[in-house]
Structure formats: structure tokens, C-alpha cells
């Protein structure tokens, strides 16, 4: 079994579960750490829908929770939240939790091709039924496309240099493994002062491209509002600035009453306020949690409540 330490576990689930007999969604089931805690907070009348796009996570989860009657585990990307809830004949929910990014299961299994610390095929698919792999991105995208992805999704200042080197190397032979890509990046990018691996940002960028992560988040957040009851909550844990920015802007937009230009004296947009932001500043892990689980260091939790 893979080691899995859920991030901001008590903080996120305490905000999420306000009614023990309510209906909740764990939109990023993973290895079930948050789901387990949510179920502990629910009464026998409460119900949890757990969603994940990773089939392996679903199979492990079904085995782990096979004796539990008030959870339904579904294989689906969270961007199809509406289809999942409609299929289950659920009209409204009391809360939804998103724990974004790559899971421990995906990172810790070398053959999944997510980690720059392993030597395995460049895969990076969260859903193994999807077609696009990291190999395709690295070996088939143009230099301009690679540069854009690495710059935008990795926020990497050396994007141009890395893209150029990828194209140069792949002309000699395809880049097939995580180690090859890691070594390539390390050969052209100086090591940061904090000692972290220079490949980190590029691997993040390629992973986001392969899985369409940012667009999925935007779609899922919009859909979640439609299903939330009044008083229901959206809790989102993000791990890098791109994710956090999407969540922050989404919460801000839906917490505004009017978006008309300031020089218009009377509101004509007709926009209604839908959310109250409960976390003015994001909640971050304690020093103790970071010491216990290094992967939690960049986590941020934001919470909003449906009006």
C-alpha cells in the first residue's frame, strides 16, 4: 500500500461538513484520506460521493470502503460532476471538496511517469484511458508550443532554453523516459538556490497539459455552484499559484453583487452574489504538518459558502 498523508485534513473537513446527515462530494478521491475523514463526521444518514479520474484509485478505493454503505465511488473527471450527480439522482449537495494536483498514488508509482526522481516511460496520464501522454507532448509539439506550455503552466523563466534543447535532442532520438527529460533539463537550467530540482516546473507544465488540469478546475467549480444548497460549502486545496489564482478569482467573481464599470451609476449587469468567502486569506499547513509531510508545504485551502 502506498503511503498517503492527506493534506490539511482536519481544516478542510471541518469547514466542509456542517450537517452530519448531509450529502457531500469528494471530487478528488485519490487514496481516500479525505473521504475517510468526511465519513467519520457523517451520521448513518449522511452520504458521500467520491470521484476520481484514475481507475487505479477507484479500484483501490472500492476495496478499502467495501463495507461502507454511505459512500459511492465513481470513475469520472470532476469536470463531469453534473453527469455523475444526475446519474445518482442527486439534485443538491451540502458541500464539495477539491484536493487539486497529482496524487500520492500517481507520484509514488514510477511506471505512471509523473516523477522526475524515477526512470520510466513519459506517461503522466491521471486517467489511463485518455490518449495524450507526456511522450506525445515532448516529442510531437512544436518548439513554440513547448515554450508556451512550459512558460505558462510551469512559470519557468528558462522555457525557451528548455524547449530548444528538447527539440534538438529529439531530432537525434525520441525522448522516452522521465530520466532522459530530467537529465536534459538539468543540463541547461541552473539549480535553484533552494537546491530543488530544476526539472520540477517543466514536469508540472507537461502534466497540466496532458491532463487539461486548469480547464477542468474552471469547469468543475462552475458546475459545483449549481448543485450547492444554500449554506453549502466549496473547499479547495491547491498546490501552486496557477491553481490558487483560478480558485481565488472564481470565489471573488461569485462573491460580487455587481460587475458594472464604476462610471455607470446604476447597475445594468443584473449579477447576483452567490458566494460568501469564508477564508479571507488561504489556510496553510502548520509547521508540524510540513515536518510530517513535506508535500504539504505549498498547500493552500480556500473555502466559500453558497448564499
Swiss-Prot record:
Keyword check for Transferase: yes
This protein's UniProt keywords: Cytoplasm, Methyltransferase, rRNA processing, S-adenosyl-L-methionine, Transferase
SUPFAM superfamilies attached to this UniProt entry: Putative methyltransferase TM0872, insert domain, S-adenosyl-L-methionine-dependent methyltransferases
InterPro entries according to UniProt: RsmH, SAM-dep_MeTrfase_MraW_recog, SAM-dependent_MTases_sf
PANTHER family: 12S RRNA N4-METHYLCYTIDINE METHYLTRANSFERASE (PTHR11265:SF0), S-ADENOSYL-METHYLTRANSFERASE MRAW (PTHR11265)
Family, similarity comment: Belongs to the methyltransferase superfamily. RsmH family.
NCBIfam families associated with the record: 16S rRNA (cytosine(1402)-N(4))-methyltransferase RsmH
Protein's name according to its UniProt entry: Ribosomal RNA small subunit methyltransferase H
Provenance organism: Caldicellulosiruptor saccharolyticus (strain ATCC 43494 / DSM 8903 / Tp8T 6331)
Amino acid at each position: 500500500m502506498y503511503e498517503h498523508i492527506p493534506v490539511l485534513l482536519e481544516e478542510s473537513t471541518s469547514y466542509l461538513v456542517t450537517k452530519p446527515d448531509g450529502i457531500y462530494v469528494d471530487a478528488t478521491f485519490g487514496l481516500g484520506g479525505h473521504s475517510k475523514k468526511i465519513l467519520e463526521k457523517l451520521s448513518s444518514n449522511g452520504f458521500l460521493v467520491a470521484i476520481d479520474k484514475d481507475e487505479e484509485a477507484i479500484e483501490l478505493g472500492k476495496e478499502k470502503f467495501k463495507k461502507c454503505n454511505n459512500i459511492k465511488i465513481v470513475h469520472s473527471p470532476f469536470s463531469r460532476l453534473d453527469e455523475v450527480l444526475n446519474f445518482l439522482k442527486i439534485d443538491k449537495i451540502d458541500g464539495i471538496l477539491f484536493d487539486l494536483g497529482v496524487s500520492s498514488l500517481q507520484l509514488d508509482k514510477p511506471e505512471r511517469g509523473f516523477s522526475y526522481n524515477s526512470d520510466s516511460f513519459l506517461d503522466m496520464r491521471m486517467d489511463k484511458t485518455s490518449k495524450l501522454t507526456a511522450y506525445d507532448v515532448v516529442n510531437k509539439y512544436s518548439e513554440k508550443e513547448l515554450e508556451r506550455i512550459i512558460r505558462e503552466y510551469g512559470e519557468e523563466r528558462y522555457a525557451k532554453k528548455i524547449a530548444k534543447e528538447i527539440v534538438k535532442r529529439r531530432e537525434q532520438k525520441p525522448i522516452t523516459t522521465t530520466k532522459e527529460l530530467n537529465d536534459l533539463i538539468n543540463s541547461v537550467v541552473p539549480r535553484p538556490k533552494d537546491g530543488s530540482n530544476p526539472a520540477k516546473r517543466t514536469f508540472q507544465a507537461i502534466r497540466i497539459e496532458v491532463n487539461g488540469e486548469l480547464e477542468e478546475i474552471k469547469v468543475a467549480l462552475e458546475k459545483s455552484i449549481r448543485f450547492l444548497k444554500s449554506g453549502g460549502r466549496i473547499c479547495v486545496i491547491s498546490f501552486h499559484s496557477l491553481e490558487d489564482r483560478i480558485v481565488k478569482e472564481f470565489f471573488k467573481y461569485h462573491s460580487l453583487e455587481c460587475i458594472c464599470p464604476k462610471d455607470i451609476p446604476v447597475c445594468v449587469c443584473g449579477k447576483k452574489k452567490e458566494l460568501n468567502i469564508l477564508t479571507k486569506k488561504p489556510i496553510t499547513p502548520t509547521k508540524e504538518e510540513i515536518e510530517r509531510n513535506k508535500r504539504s508545504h505549498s498547500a493552500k485551502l480556500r473555502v466559500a459558502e453558497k448564499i
